[in-house]
A protein has these predicted regions:
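Core catalytic alpha/beta fold that binds nucleotide/phospho-ligands
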Residues: 1-112
């Protein structure tokens, strides 16, 4: 079992999200659509997904060659975030997101 965690400041993402190239380099089309649809909290959603990518990378990259764009998230029908690696569901990885007004955190647990 491997664990990864990442914490990000939301303020930092307010600046980064002004750069469209950054968004397209880091997030999938589906992630951009999902986060952008959260008008009021879009920055939090982008930031927590970035933290999630970092947490997943830390949990599994010891044995795999991955880049940040290989990792993405989709919500299940129940709203739980699920991890996808290179477009395929990674059921061996659990992810948890949380955020407040200033900070986001993500924790990933891999059983592989």
């Amino acid at each position: 079992m491997n664990i990864g965690i990442d914490i990000e400041e939301i303020k930092r993402f307010q600046k980064l999200l002004k750069d469209k190239n950054f968004i397209e380099r880091v997030f999938s089309k589906d992630e951009i659509e999902y986060c952008s649809s959260k008008k009021k909290n879009a920055v939090q959603h982008f930031a927590v997904r970035f933290a999630g990518k970092e947490a997943v990378w830390k949990a599994i990259n010891k044995s795999r060659k991955l880049v940040i764009t290989d990792i993405s998230f989709k919500n299940s029908v129940l709203g739980k975030p699920e991890v996808y690696i290179k477009g395929k569901k990674a059921s061996y990885i659990d992810i948890s997101f949380s955020h407040n007004k200033t900070t986001v955190v993500a924790v990933a647990v891999s059983t592989k």
